[in-house]
Amino acid sequence: MMAAAKRLEPVYNELRELVRDSYYVMADETPHPVLENDRPGALHRGYMWDFYLPRYHTPFFEYHEGRGESGVDTLIGGKVKVVQSDGFVVYDKFDTLPGRLHLCCWAHVRRKFVEAEGNDPPRARHALDEIEKLYQVERRIKEEKLQGEAIVKLRREISYPIVRELEQWCKREYASTVVNSPIAKAMLYMYTRFEQLAGYVNDAQFRIDNNPVERSIRPLTLNRKNVLFSGSHEAAHAAAIFFSLLGCCRENKINPKEWMEDVLLSLIHISEPTRQE
């Protein structure tokens, strides 16, 4: 596996450059346990970061030993202008940079209010009903096959007022919630991210949520159940290479086995592949 990953690394590096050169990237991260060689039996909690390109239906996985700000350096060091995330604090770094935009995810907001239904049914239901209206607009866009300015126009006319009304509702209602209750947490999660949640209405290519990157990261979750951990940090990096390239195949309906065989057989005959090769 390590030898194959080494041969595939030039392809993986090209994929990284595609991410760095992209305008709009979705981001998420998930734990990836790694065996600690200096402490037999101990596991280090590493992270796989997934940078997903909606334009190309392409995931790119990058292993980091932690979940700190260094995880987003690939994005910050490139030409990426817009990052969409679940609102995890490290992505806030993007908001501080000139000419950059950080979007958040309405699916995560909806999830918070679903969790709060048992705690405060009336208010949780109100929020969920309003969020459903936002998704109805997105379904209409898809059904009517709208493009470009037509998408922006519809979102600004229908979705944006709903977002702002939710903001005002949240501002009014939060004061009467019990601190740290599920409904209070849901409201606070939404209220502190309203600008990042509203931004998707202004560009047709932006998505209402981060669901594509979450779908692309699921195979890693399944892998954790089967493999449990990587044997070293180097092995975790190799896993990131395979997850990235096989994920690209899967997302673009390419047979991963055939693609892998074709590429590895081609690379066998090239001692030091150039960027073009």
Predicted regions and their residues:
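A short structural micro-motif
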Residues: 3, 266-267
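Single conserved hydrophobic/aromatic residue that forms the stacking wall/gate
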Residues: 268-277
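Short, flexible helix/strand-to-coil boundary loops that buttress conserved ligand/catalytic motifs
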Residues: 95, 117, 201, 274
